[in-house]
Structures are given as C-alpha cells and as structure tokens.
C-alpha cells in the first residue's frame, strides 16, 4: 500500500515559496531604489525651463507700457504739448510694442501646449514603470502622487498665468485704443470748428461796392466790445433790406450745414465705439472658445491615455495569469514525478 506523502510535499512547497518570496523581495527592493532615484531626477528635470521667467518679463513689459500710456495721456490729448508728428510716432511705437508682446504671448502658449503633449507621450511610453512603482508604494502604505497628476497641476497653473497675461495685453491694447479714439474725436471737433465760412454771393446786384468795402471780414481790427458793437450797428445800417435777407438766408444755411456735419461726426464716433466694443466682445469670445477647446483636447488626451494604460494593464494581467497557469502545471508535473520517485525509492 502506498504511503501518504502529502505533508512532506506541502513542506517542500512551503520551503520553495519562502525562498522565492525572499529573493523577489530583495530584487524588488534594489530595483525600487534604482527606479525611485531615476524617476525623482526625471520629475525634477521635467519643469526646469524658463517659462515662468519669460512670463514674468512679459508682464513687467506690459506694466511698464501701461505706465507710459497713463503718463503721456494728458500731453497726448493736448495739441500744445505734443505735435501731430510726435503723436503719430508714439502711435507707431506703441502699436509695434503691443504686436511684439502679443507674438511673445502666442509663442509661450504654443510652447506650453507642445511641452504638455510631449510630457503626456513620455508618461504613456513609461506607464508600465510608473504603475509598478505606484503599486509597490501603495503596498507599503505610502501616499504617492502620480507624476502625471503633477504634470496636470503644473499645466493648469501655467494656463492660469497665460490667461493673466492675455487679460493684461487686452487691457493695455484697449487703453491705447481709447486714447486714440479721444484724439480722433478732438481732431474732428477742431476740423469742424476750423471749417472756412462760405463766401457771400458775388452778384453785383445784391451788394454795392461800398457795402463790400465795409464788410465785417475786411473791417479794421477793434479793441473793445463796445467798438465792435458800434461797428456792427454801422455796418447793418448801411445794408439794404434785401442784403439783410440774403445774409440771414446764408447764415441759416451755414447753421444747417454745420448741424449736419456735427450729426455726421457724432454718428462716426458712435460707429467707431460700436466697432471697438464688438471687437472686444469677439476677442473675449474667441479667448473663451480657445480655452474650452484646449480643455476638451486635454480631456481627450487624458481619456486616450487612460484607455491605453488600461489595455496595457489588461494584457499584462493576462500574461501574468498565463505564466502562473504554466508554472502551476509544470510544478504539479514535477511534484508528481518527484512523489512517484520517492514512492518508488521507499
């Protein structure tokens, strides 16, 4: 009758498992130290760039330009302190500076987008390594933050910095546009006031030679208001009733013409303000839309990354299960042969 060797078999299996677990623990400890050292260096070097410094420089330039605009605004709107040539030169310089700052902002925005996408691809290519490290850390009851979460936090922070710069650029640009509009309004008013008076009728039948010689435009300069009133009364007394009617008609036509010009100027100013408001609204709307699109793209990248990571983990689990099944089968066969050998020897 065959003896019961099950207790001996269980002892052998326990000894083999203990030795294997001890060796795996030593190997995992050494490998974990090496990977922690390499990954800590990689995480530290991940954000070593001059993005924040460049953003700080751009913000400093915008603040300085805003100060310059505020300081020069009073002289800019005064014709006695600045000439038209100086104002045009200031407009050109300020416009060029704003364009350069906007290009710098676009460069920083594109750089951050490319850096974030490159970091996501790097995590995607090394996802198995990070998952192994995090699983070991969690087994040791240590709170660990995934490097991808750190990257997402840094990316959100930098997006906030870019939004702040965008608001500053819009504010400085709107300030510059406002003083340009005020200058345009003042110039239109001056042009309206300096419009030459229409000449009186040249018909010889309406005015005599004596009346033309003593007209107000050709009269001698007066020194006091009383002299001016006296001169005006003398001039009116020498004109005929028909001439007075003609002057009154021309005066009414001139007033109507000036009123029409004033209405046109007001309409133009209102149109300019409406255009500027629409431009600002469109700019804000486009900014919000671009931010929403960026968030959607980021969410899509995260979803794709999680799906690929899940597929890799699933394939890894399948391979591990297959290896475990094979090892179990081979172990059972070996143990069976070993038991038969012991039984044969016994």
From Swiss-Prot:
The record ties this protein, via SUPFAM superfamilies, to:
SNARE fusion complex
Task: Kindly list the biological process annotations in GO that this record carries.
Answer: endoplasmic reticulum membrane fusion; protein transport; retrograde vesicle-mediated transport, Golgi to endoplasmic reticulum; vesicle fusion with endoplasmic reticulum
Asked if Transport is a keyword of the record, the answer is yes
Q: Which residues lie on this side of the membrane: Cytoplasmic?
A: 1-324
Record carries keyword Endoplasmic reticulum: yes
One example GO MF annotation: SNAP receptor activity
Enumerate the PROSITE patterns for this protein.
T_SNARE
Segments forming a coiled coil: none
Q: Which residues lie on this side of the membrane: Lumenal?
A: 343-346
Q: How does it sit in the membrane?
A: Single-pass type IV membrane protein
Pfam families for this protein? Syntaxin-18_N
The compartments listed are: Endoplasmic reticulum membrane
Q: Which residues cross the membrane?
A: 325-342
What are the t-SNARE coiled-coil homology domain coordinates in residue numbering? Answer: 255-317
Which keywords annotate this record?
Coiled coil, Endoplasmic reticulum, ER-Golgi transport, Membrane, Protein transport, Transmembrane, Transmembrane helix, Transport
One GO cellular component assignment for this chain's record is:
Golgi to ER transport vesicle membrane
Q: What job does this protein perform?
A: Syntaxin required for targeting and fusion of Golgi-derived retrograde transport vesicles with the ER.
Subunit comment: Component of a SNARE complex consisting of UFE1, USE1, SEC20 and SEC22 or YKT6.
Q: Which family does it belong to?
A: Belongs to the syntaxin family.
**Protein name per Swiss-Prot or TrEMBL:** Syntaxin UFE1
Q: Which organism is it from?
A: Saccharomyces cerevisiae (strain ATCC 204508 / S288c)
């Amino acid at each position: 009758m065959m003896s019961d060797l099950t207790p001996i078999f269980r002892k052998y299996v326990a000894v083999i498992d203990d030795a294997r677990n001890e060796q795996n623990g030593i190997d995992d400890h050494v490998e974990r130290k090496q990977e922690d050292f390499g990954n800590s260096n990689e995480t530290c070097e991940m954000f070593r760039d001059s993005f924040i410094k460049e953003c700080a420089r751009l913000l400093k330039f915008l603040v300085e330009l805003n100060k310059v605009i505020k300081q020069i605004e009073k002289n800019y709107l005064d014709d006695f302190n600045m000439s038209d040539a100086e104002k045009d030169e200031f407009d050109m310089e300020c416009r060029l500076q704003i364009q350069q700052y906007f290009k710098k902002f676009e460069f920083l925005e594109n750089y951050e987008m490319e850096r974030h996408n490159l970091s996501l691809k790097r995590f995607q290519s090394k996802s198995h390594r990070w998952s192994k490290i995090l699983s070991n850390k969690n087994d040791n009851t240590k709170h660990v933050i995934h490097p991808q979460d750190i990257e997402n936090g840094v990316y959100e922070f930098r997006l906030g910095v870019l939004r702040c710069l965008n608001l500053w650029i819009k504010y400085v640009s709107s300030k510059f546009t406002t003083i340009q509009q005020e200058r345009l309004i003042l110039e239109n008013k001056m042009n309206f006031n300096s419009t030459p008076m229409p000449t009186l009728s040249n018909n010889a039948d309406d005015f005599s030679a004596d009346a033309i010689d003593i007209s107000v435009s050709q009269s001698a300069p007066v020194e006091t208001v009383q002299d001016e009133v006296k001169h005006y009364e003398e001039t009116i007394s020498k004109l005929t009733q028909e001439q007075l009617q003609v002057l009154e008609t021309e005066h009414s036509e001139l007033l109507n013409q000036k009123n029409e010009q004033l209405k046109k100027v007001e309409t133009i100013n209102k149109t300019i303000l409406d255009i500027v408001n629409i431009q600002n609204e469109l700019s804000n709307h486009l900014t919000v839309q671009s931010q929403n699109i960026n968030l959607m793209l980021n969410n899509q990248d995260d979803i794709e990354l999680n799906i690929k990571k899940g597929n890799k983990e699933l394939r890894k689990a399948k391979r591990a299960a297959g290896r475990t099944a094979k090892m179990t089968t081979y172990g059972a066969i070996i143990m069976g042969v070993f038991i038969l050998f012991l039984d044969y020897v016994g």
